[in-house]
Each structure stands twice: as structure tokens, then as C-alpha cells.
Curated annotation (Swiss-Prot):
Family statement drawn from the similarity comment of this UniProt entry: Belongs to the importin beta family.
Gene Ontology BP terms: protein import into nucleus
Protein name per Swiss-Prot or TrEMBL: Importin-13
Gene Ontology CC: cytoplasm; nucleus
Superkingdom of the organism of origin: Eukaryota
Keywords: Cytoplasm, Nucleus, Protein transport, Repeat, Transport
Gene3D superfamilies (alphabetical): Leucine-rich Repeat Variant (1.25.10.10)
Location of this chain's protein in the cell: Cytoplasm; Nucleus
Importin N-terminal domain boundaries: 40-106
Organism: Gallus gallus (Chicken)
InterPro entries membership: ARM-like (IPR011989), ARM-type_fold (IPR016024), Exportin-1/Importin-b-like (IPR013598), Importin_beta-like_NTR (IPR051345), Importin_rep_1 (IPR040709), Importin_rep_2 (IPR040944), Importin_rep_3 (IPR040520)
Gene that encodes the chain: IPO13
Length: 958
């Protein structure tokens, strides 16, 4: 069709005529100018709710109009009905209903999208009229379309009726009817199924019904069952859907219908009907086997969905039918077949993953019975779960190396996730099978490794180890009598493959807590781990395992420390591992060194970090460029990760079992502090060249921040130097990481008299520099503002005396906080709210704070109400509520005046709230000085009113 020339935007005052609506629609669809499109859309929305909408809608549906115009025509019918939240005039219902029936009949053989749109409009109207104005809506629809009409083909009318009946429940599910009306309408619709289901049954059973009609019937049934219709009323159609599974054209739609029908939560009430469904499900087994043999993944997938839907949703109800235990066990075995379906997931099959949650559900239901009944079910189902373990471990096996080499990276990732799901299932199954499961795995592994006549594949060995690892990672195996044997077997494994080696490493890591209780066995596995460190393909598994061993067994590692450090140094120097693994390795070494004597720690630290210090000295002399920047960040990262875990005071110890092994607290300076003091000047030199680079500054701050967190009071000797350096850094180029480190220092040391002077000086300097930044315009630095607000809150919490300093401009800080409340970044606003909730309670005890709040509190209230009125994200309302609560609690006499004055402004905080609503909110806030939760509820309620969202479905869960 030829496009018309670009039309100008329709003026806002233009009459709502057919011609003007057509022009606006043409502009909306074809105008390349986005502003014109937006204007057209805005005008069309006004047209939809205008009185003339009823008139032009029908004219736009003329057959000579293009589909885009016809498609938009029914819009006023849906936008004006109560089902979507507004109202229509009762005297227009009959006319509207009649017109919609007429046009649906006309379009029955025409454009599918226009027909669907008209059906949605009639469905929306029906929902708004039920039950009072149109009590038998569905029966009337069926009757109207079954009436003879010589102008319209019978099949076309049938399809139109089925489309209407399909969209009606769908429209109900998405409607914004009030909750009480929704219940009413659902009940009416459920009763109306008596007019629908016989028709659907008749169409499915007719021999001459074409496939496309039957498919539409199944879709319609699938839509209706989601209205919580009693399962026994669906019985005939479910059986018909089972029959349709034999027709390849209807298979997918029939699966959807059966699954939707038996998955309804209410279905478990109809146990007799559920029992009747087991035979037809079991009857699908031959079709399932044929599909598996022929590689028909779609059919096997669909049949599995049906079996799992019945088993998973109703296992408790079916288990309760003791006299039918054999039929349910047959269903369980059918699902077991689906779990163990031949082929490798996801390349040869995608079905087995559907079944995993069923095994969780069945186990939960069995274990929820009282002990006597549970014992009976355990007797039946324990063998099933042992079989499940074998099936899962078989499914977890890697394919041959050759086959795996052809897999795409996406397929490998899906297989990895699938194995994680299997691992989670095995961990869960342990609750049912207990120690016997570990014994079974150990026996199988032992036979596998000692059978010289029949050498096993590495895949089989790896899968059994993977089963062990899955359980040992989350279950306390310290009292298992098979773990010593397993530790003894591990060195006998012939590792010829990366996947197997990875699993060996992860299994050792999973047993690290057991090794801590049985240190004599460490030497059995540690050499394997150290050897694996040198293999880049085993990077993640070997490094994470060494880290676990060093963390859990550190008090038993001194005899091996020299070897561990030497091997680690070697792989670090060779740059075998990626950055993140290098960081983990340094953390491992930190744990290891923590258990040594101070002299030993210093000696090892010297040999470990000297090469990096030398490299850093060299880099500090070079002209800054991207490559040496990465090297600097890497070295600083290594140091900060080492210092994160190197803790001779044992702050990180929380295991009772290690209490007896703890070394006495060391006297003298902490080794980390010794090293930091030695490299301090070098770090300052690096900073001098890289001060304008946020990443380098962040890396420097990270060294000290992690050290402070780990060492706590032991860091004290460094405080004066660090405060001075931070002051120089922040004065030159303000950065958030420097404020964050300042906050840490305030948190740990500000309350100690000896350290108060340098921290006070640093706090005042950071405050002064940041205030200057605010004067210049802080909008480009939300991260700095965020960190600064957190620093102020921390200072008020830990050392409020800082706000008594004569050269601290409390008024300026207050106004910075108010300005920060208006930032678009939610974390910044949250931090600002945190500042005020700490500041306001100090009004009475800190005179400068009290004076500033009393003189400027109205500005704060104004900003808070603006946020509540719609300027801030709804997710922040709890934080604004806390400020209002604090104002009311600590400045009540002022707040009562401020809130009255603020609310008297027209349109404030929103034009959507009336003076009465504002007055109610004000009084509610002023009355509540005890219950903070109640204030939060008030604020949430008021913000919805301000945004025009109150009472809508959109905010039902808010």
C-alpha cells in the first residue's frame, strides 16, 4: 500500500472524529519523528476515553480500512470498561455488546489479529458486567455463535467462538478487578464451564472436526482449567486430551492442556479423579519408549512433563492412597525412566532435568509422615532412591573426550549447570539414605579402583567422586567411617584427564574440615594439590582447594609451610594463574602464615613479597601507561589479599575444635604492620604518579582497608601515617575509596584518645574538601556523595564529639545532606537518609546540631515530602519514613509547625492529593512517636496516593 505524506501532529484541541483518529493512527505507525509519534499517542489516549469513542470505533472497523486501523478500533471498548479499572455507562452495555457480536461475526473469516482484539474487548465487557448486568454471559456467547447465519461459514463462526472463549479466562487473569469482584467473577465463570465443556467435548469427539479446530479446542480447555474448575468436571476433556496425544499435530497442545489441568492446586482434593489419571499416564510408556528410541526429543519431553506434573503436584495425596501403592510406584518408576533417559544432557536429551524437583517433593512427603507410616514408605522407597543415585551418577558422567570436544561452549555450560542440579539432588537424597549412601559410593569406588581385570573409564571414577564431593560439601561427614578409606583411595586414582583431576581437587577441598580433625591424613592429599597448582587447566580447583585446606587446617600445616610457600611462589612468578586465582592463592598463604611464629612469618613474608616490591619500585619510576597500571593494580591486589587473611590474633577463628591449637598472642609489632611500614614510602611514591587514577587509588586504599578490618587494634601504629597520606590524597583528588577508608578508621579508632587527634584532623580535612566539591556541583560524583554521607553517619554513631569541632560547618553539612536526598541514585539517597537518622537524635546533646536542625529543619522536611510525593523511588520510602519518625521524636514542636506550613502549598507534595488527605497524613505522622513500622506504613500509603497508584492491582504487593 502506498504511504501518505508525513502529517503534522494533531493539535490538542482537534475534534475526535473518524478522520482525525485515522490521521493520528497513521502518524503513530508511519511518522519517523518520535516526538510526533508521542503526540499522536497522547492524543489517541484522550480520544479513547472521549464520549465520541463509541461512534468512531465502529466506523474504523469498516472492511475498506487497513489492518492497522482496524486493529486499533476496539481499543476504546477495552479502555472504557470496568474490567480495566474505569467505568462504562450501563445504558451503553447492550449497544456495545450487540456491536461487538456483530463485528466478531463479520471478522470471523478475516484478519486474525483484529478478531482477537475484538474478542478481548467483548471478554473485557463481559467481565465488567458479570454477574449482575450479564448473568449468563458465556451461555449467551455460545448461543449467539451457534445461531445460523447464512453469511458466515460455520467453521469460521466456530473458530471465532473458540477464540472468544479462550481469551475470556486469559483476560480475567490479567484484569484489574478489585479483589472481592475477582472472587465473584471467578465463581461465575467456574459455573459457566457447564456451557463450554460440553461444546468442547463434542468438537473433539466429532470425526469430521479438522485438526485446527481440535487444536483450538485444546487451547480453550487449557485456558479454562486455570480458573480452578473442579478436576472431576474436567475429567472427560482430560481423557480426550490423552487421546489427542496420539495425533502428532495435536501433541504439544494436548500436553499443555493435560499439564495445566492436573497442575491446578485445587486438583489434589479430587483424589478419585487423580487415581483415574494414573492408568492413562502409564499408558503413555510405550509411546515414550518409541520416542526415545527414535530420538524424538519433543515427544519424550512432553510425556515426561505429564508424568512429572501428576507425580510432583499430587505425591502426598497419592501416597495417602495406601491400597493403590503399586500404581503410584509404577508412576514413580516411569519418572525414574525419564530421569535416566539415554543420552547426554543437553545434546542428546533435554528431558531428565524436568524430573529432579519431583524427587525432592516425594522425599519431603515421605519424611513428613508420622514415624510408623514413614517406616513403611521408607521400606518401599529407599531402594528406589538408591536406584536414583545410580541413575543420577550415570547421567552426571562426561561423554567421551572425542564427543565432548565437539560440544559448543553453551552446551558445556548447560551440562555444568545440570551437574550442579544433580549435585544438589544427591545432597538432598542423603537425608533419606544417610550414611549408607556414603558406604555404597565408597564400595563402588573401591571396587572400581582395585579391579585390575576390568579397567574402568575415567568418567565412571569421576562421577562416583562427584557424588562424594556433592555430599561432603554440605553435610558434616566428620563422623563417617568411610572418609579415611576414601582419603586412602584418592592417591590411587590414575589422573589422566582434566575433568577427573578437577573433581579430585574439589573432593579434597570438600573434605578439608575432616582433614582438620584428622591431620595425620593431610600428607596423603597435600602433594596432589601442590602438584595440581602447576597446571593452568586446574587453576580454579587446585587454588580453591589449597585455600580451604590452609583455612581449615592451618594449625597443622607448619611442617608443610615451607613447601607450600615455595610451590606457591613458583606458580605466582610463572604467572600460571589468572588474576582472581592469584588473589585466592595469596589469601591461602595468609591463612597458612597466620599459624606460624612471628619470626617465621616475617621470613616467609620477606621471600614471598620481595620480588613484588622490587617490581613495584621499578614500576613507580616508569612513566604511567596502561600496561604498567595493570601491573601495579595486580601487585597491590596481591598484597591486600594476603593481608586480608594474615591474622596472628585469630580474629577469624570461630571453630571450637581449633581452640586448643591456638598459639599464644604474639608480643611486639604485627608482621603485617611491619611490612606495611616498610613499603609505605613506596606506596606513596606510586600514588604520587597515579593520584588521578581511581582504580590505582582504590587498590592502594584496599590494602589498608582490608588490613584494618583484619588487624583491628593491631593496626594502631599505622594510624598517624595513614591519616596523613589519606589527607594528602583526598586534598589533591577526592575519591570515594579514600572516604571509605577514612570511615573504617573512624569506626575502629576514633573512640580511642591516643588516635583521636589524627583522625579528627583527617575527618575535618575530608569534610572541608567535600564541602568545596558540593559548592562546585556534586552531581557528577554520586559515589563520593554516597561515601561522604556514610562517613558522617559513622562519625555521629562512633564519635559524635567530632561535630563539636569549632571549625566544622554543621549547617553546610546539613544542606549537603538535603541536596543528596534529591539525587537520582538510590544508594546515595539511602546513605543521606542514614546520615539524618543519626543526626536528628543528637539535637539535644550536641548544641551545634540542635541549632542547625531547629533553624533549617523545614528544608529537610520539604525535601523528604518531595521524595514521598513522587520525586524519589518507591523503594526508598522506608528510609524517608525513618527521617520523619526521627523528626517527630526529637523535634516534635518544630515538626508540627513545619508540616502544616509545607502542606498548605498548592499541589505539594503532589497535585493528586487533596487538602483533606494531606491533613490526615500530617496528623497520622504527628500522632505516631513510638511505632516506627506504623510510620513506614503511613508513608507507603501516602506515596501511593501522591503517585495516583493507590488501590490499583499494580501496587497490590507493595
Amino acid at each position: 500500500m502506498e504511504r501518505r505524506a508525513e502529517a503534522p501532529p494533531p493539535p490538542q484541541g482537534l475534534d475526535f472524529t473518524v478522520e482525525n483518529v485515522e490521521k493520528a493512527l497513521h502518524q503513530l505507525y508511519y511518522d519517523p519523528n518520535i516526538e510526533n509519534k508521542n503526540l499522536a499517542q497522547k492524543w489517541l489516549m484522550q480520544a479513547q476515553v472521549s464520549p465520541q469513542a463509541w461512534h468512531f470505533s465502529w466506523l474504523l472497523l469498516n472492511m475498506d480500512k487497513v489492518p492497522e486501523i482496524q486493529y486499533s478500533a476496539p481499543a476504546p471498548c477495552t479502555s472504557r470498561s470496568p474490567a480495566t479499572g474505569t467505568t462504562s455507562l450501563p445504558d451503553q452495555y447492550e449497544s456495545l455488546k450487540s456491536q461487538l457480536f456483530t463485528h466478531i461475526t463479520r471478522f470471523a473469516g478475516g484478519s486474525k489479529i483484529v478478531l482477537t482484539r475484538l474478542c478481548v474487548a467483548l471478554a473485557s465487557l463481559a467481565l465488567s458486567m458479570m454477574p449482575e448486568a450479564w448473568p449468563c454471559a458465556v451461555a449467551d456467547m455460545v448461543r449467539m455463535f451457534q445461531a445460523e447465519d447464512s453469511n458466515v461459514d460455520g467453521r469460521a463462526r466456530c473458530l471465532a467462538l473458540l477464540e472468544l472463549l479462550t481469551v475470556l479466562p486469559e483476560e480475567f487473569q490479567t484484569s484489574r478487578l478489585p479483589q472481592y469482584r475477582k472472587g465473584q467473577v471467578r465463581s461465575v465463570l467456574a459455573q459457566e464451564c457447564g456451557s463450554v465443556f460440553p461444546l468442547l467435548e463434542q468438537l473433539l469427539q466429532q470425526q469430521d472436526s479438522p485438526g485446527f479446530i481440535k487444536q483450538k479446542v485444546l487451547k480453550c480447555f487449557s485456558s479454562w482449567v486455570q480458573l480452578e474448575i473442579p478436576l472431576m468436571d474436567c475429567e472427560n476433556l482430560i481423557q480426550a486430551a490423552f487421546t489427542s496425544l496420539q495425533d502428532p499435530e495435536l501433541f504439544d497442545t494436548a500436553v499443555e492442556a493435560v499439564v495445566n489441568a492436573i497442575s491446578q492446586p485445587d486438583a489434589q482434593r479430587y483424589v478419585n479423579t487423580l487415581l483415574k489419571l494414573i492408568p492413562p499416564v502409564l499408558g503413555l510408556q510405550e509411546q515414550l519408549r518409541q520416542a526415545v528410541q527414535s530420538g524424538d526429543m519433543e515427544t519424550s519431553h512432553g510425556i515426561c512433563r505429564i508424568a512429572v506434573a501428576l507425580g510432583e503436584n499430587h505425591s502426598r495425596a497419592l501416597l495417602d492412597q495406601v491400597e493403590h501403592w503399586q500404581s503410584f510406584l509404577a508412576l514413580v518408576n516411569m519418572i525414574m525412566f525419564c530421569t535416566g533417559i539415554p543420552g547426554h544432557y543437553p545434546v542428546n536429551e533435554t528431558t531428565s532435568s524436568l524430573t529432579l524437583t519431583f524427587w525432592y517433593t516425594l522425599q519431603d512427603d515421605i519424611l513428613s509422615f508420622e514415624p510408623d507410616k514413614q517406616a513403611v514408605y521408607q521400606q518401599v522407597y529407599r531402594p528406589v532412591y538408591f536406584q536414583l543415585v545410580d541413575v543420577l551418577l550415570h547421567k552426571a558422567q562426561f561423554p567421551s573426550d572425542e564427543e565432548y570436544g565437539f560440544w559448543s561452549s553453551d552446551e558445556k555450560e548447560q551440562f555444568r549447570i545440570y551437574r550442579v542440579d544433580i549435585s544438589d539432588t544427591l545432597m538432598y537424597v542423603y537425608e533419606m539414605l544417610g550414611a549408607e549412601l556414603l558406604s555404597s559410593l565408597y564400595d563402588k569406588l573401591g571396587r572400581l579402583l582395585t579391579n585390575t581385570e576390568q579397567p574402568s573409564t575415567w568418567q565412571h571414577t569421576e562421577a562416583l567422586l562427584y557424588g562424594f564431593q556433592s555430599i561432603a560439601e554440605t553435610i558434616d561427614v566428620n563422623y563417617s567411617d568411610v572418609v579415611p578409606g576414601l582419603i586412602g583411595l584418592i592417591p590411587r586414582i590414575s589422573i589422566s584427564n582434566v575433568q577427573l583431576a578437577d573433581t579430585v581437587m574439589f573432593t579434597i577441598g570438600a573434605l578439608s574440615e575432616w582433614l582438620a580433625d584428622h591431620p595425620v591424613m593431610i600428607n596423603n592429599v597435600l602433594p596432589l594439590v601442590l602438584q595440581a597448582l602447576g597446571n593452568p587447566e586446574l587453576s580454579i580447583s587446585s587454588v580453591s582447594t589449597l585455600k580451604k585446606i590452609c583455612r581449615e587446617c592451618k594449625y597443622d600445616l607448619p611442617p608443610y609451610a615451607a613447601n607450600i610457600v615455595a610451590v606457591s611462589q613458583e606458580v605466582l612468578m610463572k604467572q600460571i594463574h589468572k588474576t582472581s586465582q592469584c588473589m585466592w592463592l595469596m589469601q591461602a598463604l595468609g591463612f597458612l602464615l597466620s599459624a606460624l611464629q612471628v619470626e617465621e612469618i616475617l621470613k616467609n613474608l620477606h621471600s614471598l613479597i620481595t620480588p613484588y616490591i622490587q617490581q613495584l619500585e621499578k614500576l613507580a619510576d616508569e612513566t604511567p601507561n596502561p600496561s604498567n597500571k595493570l601491573a601495579i593494580i595486580h601487585i597491590l591486589g596481591l598484597l591486600s589479599n594476603l593481608f586480608t587473611t594474615l591474622d596472628i590474633s585469630h580474629h577469624d577463628d570461630d571453630h571450637e575444635s581449633t581452640e586448643v591449637k591456638k598459639l599464644p598472642v604474639q608480643q611486639g609489632p604485627n608482621p603485617v604492620v611491619v611490612v606495611l611500614q616498610q613499603v609505605f614510602q613506596l606506596i606513596q611514591k606510586v600514588l604520587s604518579k597515579w593520584l588521578n587514577d581511581a582504580q590505582v587509588v582504590e587498590s592502594v586504599c584496599a590494602i589498608f582497608e582490608k588490613s584494618v578490618k583484619t588487624l583491628l587494634d593491631d593496626f594502631a601504629p599505622m594510624v598517624p601515617q595513614l591519616c596523613e597520606m589519606l589527607g594528602q590524597m583526598y586534598s589533591t583528588i577526592p575519591q570515594a575509596s579514600a572516604i571509605d577508608l577514612t570511615r573504617q578508621l573512624v569506626h575502629i579508632f576514633a573512640h580511642e584518645p591516643a588516635h583521636f587527634p589524627p583522625i579528627k584532623a583527617l575527618f575535618l580535612l575530608v569534610t572541608s574538601v567535600t564541602l568545596t566539591l558540593f559548592q562546585q556541583g556534586p552531581r557528577d560524583h554520586p559515589d563520593i556523595v554516597d561515601s561522604f554521607m556514610q562517613l558522617l553517619a559513622q562519625a555521629l554513631k562512633r564519635k559524635p564529639d567530632l561535630f563539636l569541632c569549632s571549625n566544622l560547618d554543621v549547617k553546610a553539612l546539613f544542606h549537603c545532606g538535603v541536596l543528596s536526598l534529591k539525587f537520582p541514585e538510590a544508594p546515595t539517597v539511602k546513605a543521606s537518609c542514614g546520615f539524618f537518622t543519626e543526626l536528628l537524635p543528637r539535637c539535644g546533646e550536641i548544641a551545634p546540631v540542635g541549632q542547625v536542625v531547629h533553624e533549617n529543619g523545614k528544608v529537610l522536611l520539604q525535601a523528604v515530602l518531595e521524595g514521598v510525593g513522587g520525586q524519589a523511588s518507591r523503594s526508598l520510602m522506608d528510609h524517608f519514613a525513618e527521617i520523619l519518625f526521627a523528626l517527630n521524636k526529637h523535634c516534635f514542636s518544630y515538626l508540627s509547625i513545619w508540616i502544616k506550613e509545607a502542606m498548605q502549598q498548592d499541589g505539594f507534595p503532589s497535585a493528586r492529593v487533596s487538602p483533606e488527605q494531606k491533613e490526615t497524613f500530617s496528623q497520622q505522622i504527628l500522632r505516631e512517636r513510638v511505632n516506627k513500622r506504623r510510620v513506614k506504613e503511613m508513608v507507603k500509603e501516602f506515596t501511593l496516593l501522591c503517585r495516583g497508584l493507590h488501590g490499583t492491582e499494580y501496587t497490590a504487593d507493595y
